[in-house]
Amino acid sequence: MHSKTNKKVKEGQKNRIRTLVVDDSPLMCRVVSEILDEDGGFEVAGQALNGKEALKMLASQEFDLCTLDVHMPGMNGLTVLKHIMIRYPTPTLMVSAFTADGSKITFDALRYGAVDFFHKPSRDNGKSMSEQGDLLCKKAKDVARVQLDAAQYLRLKTSCNTSCKKKKNRTTDSIVIMHGGTGSYASMLNLLPTMGKTPLSPVIVSMAVDQEHLDAFVKYLRSYVPFNIFSASALQEIKPGSVYFISKEQAGTFDYKKGQLVLETAPRADLNEKEGGIDLLLFSAAEHFGEKALALFLSGENCQGISGAKEVLRSKGTVLAQKPETCLRPDLSRAVLHQKKAGAATLPELATKAACWS
């Protein structure tokens, strides 16, 4: 996979994002194209009804973004994606029905180089078409801005859960918190399986994704890690050696109930544009764990979490960020590294640190 720079996107959106829409349904091609056209920030420069048409168009002209149907007859979406990443590297947004059966294929696509995915627009999913259109355009713009040379094919092996049983009433005085936004699916798919062993401390993962997608991602990840992972409940008992995920819809704080460490989650309320649920989680971690708090920042597009990172550092905890050049979206990592005493590390280095932190 070679580097490719999207100059049109980097020039402050002076030019519209040249987009290729790929879907075997002419109706869905038209719906997606109309949504992008109406936004004004996109130029739908091509439509393809199958993989061969898509690859032919990519060979003849340059696109800033490709939206790609997961399920297509003949050459399916995953096969097309592999060809795109090898022959015509282009930021790709998978467009999926995201059914129970389809979620695995969708997450497989993220391993093969897709940046993110989006539900196919529908009048039956509980959101207005206008709201779905706005969300699609925002996600498409985020995908078009990625550092494509940071994308990679992830070869994952299935793993048996070998988590050892913990002693009853064991408490913990250390914590690991991970946070990421756009591009963090790929970071997590790389980092957590690389840990290879049960972490010594509890690990809390905050991802800027919807709860529905987070639950499906946790289920998908279970096949590739040798330890317990969960979607955190409203009052989650926290144990060493397990990983707990919270979504962008949640804010978490730590407390002790009858001597047991718990994570209390509630609907997220942003403090302001630059502070959100991750900051509240980090404030709480700094208060309860002090120098035994480890905060890891991964790929992401916004700077929420910086205030929390400062508090962890002030409490003598440790803050590390994924090296910006390895992030699909380096904005968050770069912002963290502007803080004194925050360090940069590769994903394998972060995996080792997280596994051994105590």
Language model region names:
Residues 45-52:
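Conserved Asp/Asn-Gly motif in the active-site loop of CheY-like receiver
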Residues 2-20, 26-37, 52-53, 63, ...:
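Conserved acid/base catalytic micro-environments in cytosolic active-site loops
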